[in-house]
Amino acid sequence: GHGKSSGKFTNGNITKWSNETSILIKKYVKKNNFTIIGSSMGAWIALKQFQKFKSQINSFLGIGSAPEFLENLMWKKFTKKIKNEIIKKGIYNLKHGNYEYPITYQLIKDGKKNKVLNKKITSKINVTLIHGMKDEVVPVSYSRKILKIFPNANKKLIVIKRGDHS
């Protein structure tokens, strides 16, 4: 994505990044309670952690949260031509602004296996979501969808009027 971490983005997927995050939590947080924070796709990875660390997570902060964006904001909106290219070549370089993002077919397929918006998280925790009203990448409605999966949480959505996705 946007970061400067080592490794090739094209070798990763939601399952891999979620598992790596879980390993880090086990190693460094151990059995302590913690707040989990995620931005954009990182919020999706953070939400996946509730499956393993639900009793330890005492709050969640999401910024421009983008769970399930691969299917809903990409695959469903791609033209047949783009879909065929991804299936045939295994990759499509998605141009957005000054960036080009290599979207692999394995990433799209893996995203479908990692749904988080269809399962309630019943923890009584603080959930704060921050989203830019001018976010053209991920609509504010995604943050509202996340709030719905936390029926027992103390929830807050902060919408930044001039905020975008970056």
Please report, for each region that a protein language model flagged, where it lies by residue:
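Hydrolase active-site cap/lid region
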Residues: S55-I103
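Short beta-strand/loop motif that positions the catalytic acidic residue
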Residues: T122-S123, L129-H131, D135
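Catalytic nucleophile-loop/oxyanion-hole region of alpha/beta-hydrolase
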Residues: G3-Y28
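Acidic catalytic loop of the alpha/beta-hydrolase fold
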Residues: K134-V138, S166
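Catalytic histidine neighborhood in serine/cysteine hydrolases
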Residues: F150-H165
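Active-site nucleophile elbow and catalytic-triad environment of alpha/beta-hydrolase enzymes
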Residues: E100-K120
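Alpha/beta-hydrolase fold nucleophile elbow
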Residues: K30-S40
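Short alpha-helix in the alpha/beta-hydrolase fold that links the catalytic acid
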Residues: P139-K148
